[in-house]
Design a protein with these regions (language model features):
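Solvent-exposed coil/turn segments that connect beta secondary-structure elements
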Residues: 105-106, 135-136, 231, 238
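C-terminal cap of thioredoxin/glutaredoxin-like
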Residues: 4-5, 27-42, 62, 183-256
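Structural alpha/beta surface segment adjacent to cysteine/selenocysteine redox centers
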Residues: 101, 112-186, 216-221, 252, ...
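Extracytoplasmic/secreted proteins, especially bacterial periplasmic and envelope-associated proteins
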Residues: 36, 40, 47, 51-54, ...
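A short beta-strand-turn-helix
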Residues: 80-98
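Short pre-active-site segment immediately N-terminal to redox-active cysteine/selenocysteine motifs
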Residues: 104-107, 222
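The canonical Cys-X-X-Cys-His
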Residues: 108-112, 225-227
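N-terminal targeting signals for export/organelle localization
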Residues: 2-5, 10, 18-79
Length: 256
């Protein structure tokens, strides 16, 4: 039996497990009538498994809609932290009419690929505000790299040095950790004495705690993840999909 067949069979079984007891509880049916209805229902579903598939598709659609509404409520409740926290890096137009928030991990392969998408949006869209949030979910090395990134942000109010650091570390090969992150920071000419001091400050821990708290509220557990307007986008969906979300947020349709 193929995986598809197994899936349909399991769905049929689950449907019948729910439906048959309900039929059995119908007092107006005789025992013989109940048995006949059960047989007809079972035979129909086995003969037409696409009904189960359609039902599953509709269930997925409703679940997606429910998730979207939940995300909208969560984003509204946490809007200040998501879009305007003083503990975040802002690139592009700080007064942009759409804010594009990315949660990333320096050891995330998909984030490495998605970086070009963010950079293209940054270059091509003068009305876009881009917010970067460190979200180190891939182990100790990721946490160390994120901590250094926060310290970089603390001595760079313009975001220019942070972006340079971000591109070099995320775009580099191999595992990102404290040693590599510090090497990149030194290479781009940052004040290393201040960086080490900032790295030991409470601000670094507070920043990452804030990022994790809002990510948890949004139900995020992987990277890259995005908040665009009142929408959550999970995964490296590609430049065109991100553009469509930005345009929909800006003017209500995929193409402005």
């Amino acid at each position: 039996m193929t995986f598809r067949s197994c899936l349909v069979a399991a769905a049929c079984s689950a449907f019948l497990a729910i439906a048959i007891p309900q039929i059995s509880q119908a007092d107006e049916l005789t025992a013989g009538q109940k048995s006949e209805v059960e047989r007809i229902l079972r035979d129909y579903l086995i003969a037409h498994p696409e009904v189960i598939q359609d039902a599953m598709a509709e269930l997925d659609k409703r679940q997606s809609a429910a998730d979207a509404e939940k995300h909208k409520a969560t984003i509204k409740q946490n809007a200040q932290t998501i879009f305007s926290s003083p503990r975040q890096v802002v690139l592009g137009n700080p007064d942009g009419n759409v804010t594009f928030v990315e949660f990333f991990d320096y050891n995330c392969g998909y984030c490495k690929r998605a970086m070009d998408d963010m950079l293209t949006l940054l270059k091509d869209d003068p009305k876009l505000k881009i917010v970067l949030k460190e979200f180190p979910v891939l182990g100790p090395g990721s946490v160390e790299a994120a901590q250094v990134a926060v310290a970089v942000r603390m001595q760079d109010k313009t975001g220019k040095k942070y972006l340079e650091f971000h591109q070099k570390l995320l775009g580099g090969r191999g595992q990102a950790d404290k040693a590599r992150a510090l090497a990149v920071a030194k290479d781009i000419g940052l004040d290393m004495t201040r960086l080490e001091k900032d790295l030991a400050s409470a601000e670094v821990k507070a920043t990452l705690q804030e990022n994790f708290k809002v990510a948890e509220a949004l139900g995020l557990n992987g990277t890259p993840s995005y908040v665009i307007g009142d929408n959550v986008v999970v995964g490296a969906v590609g430049l065109e999909a991100l553009k469509e979300k930005v345009n929909t947020t800006r003017c209500g349709k995929p193409t402005c």
